[in-house]
């Protein structure tokens, strides 16, 4: 583990497994653009997830946090799109979204997989998990895509 020192952060030793320099991180996240029409609460969460991926050059674990964080944006939008969402957990929102045709079967499958990963980490079942950026970027991209698709459809 790299010890951070001021005045500049030091790249995580593992960063060089996937990029040669910090500037390469911009290419890694360049397609993660928040589209118009996304509620500001979800847009802020997606931008934060993107920046966590970018900063995983300095703290490798940020890529894992980015995946977990990006699911928050999906949950925000699902709550907005699903009638009577109330305080249902994400699992319930995914099931209802699929049943109501708000989510496709494929979207529901991806979200449920991400939810299981998130829950495993959040509830201590999966500890010391580090998701390399090569795995994290497609998962965060999926959250961006699902939010974009949900927001392209008028709320019911």
Where are these regions (language model features)?
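Charge-enriched, short contiguous segments at helix-coil
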Residues: 105-156
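Amphipathic alpha-helical interface elements
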Residues: 2-116
């Amino acid at each position: 583990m790299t010890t951070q020192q001021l005045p500049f952060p030091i790249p995580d030793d593992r960063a060089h497994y996937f990029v040669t320099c910090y500037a390469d991180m911009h290419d890694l996240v360049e397609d993660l653009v928040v589209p118009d029409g996304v509620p500001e609460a979800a847009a802020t969460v997606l931008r934060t997830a993107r920046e966590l991926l970018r900063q995983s050059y300095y703290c490798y674990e940020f890529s894992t946090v980015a995946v977990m964080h990006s699911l928050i944006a999906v949950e925000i939008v699902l709550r907005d799109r699903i009638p009577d969402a109330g305080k249902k957990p994400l699992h319930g929102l995914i099931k209802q979204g699929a049943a109501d045709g708000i989510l496709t079967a494929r979207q529901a499958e991806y979200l449920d997989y991400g939810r299981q990963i998130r829950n495993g980490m959040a509830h201590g079942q999966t500890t010391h998990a580090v998701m390399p950026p090569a795995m994290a970027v497609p998962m965060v991209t999926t959250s961006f895509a699902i939010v974009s698709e949900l927001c392209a459809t008028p709320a019911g």
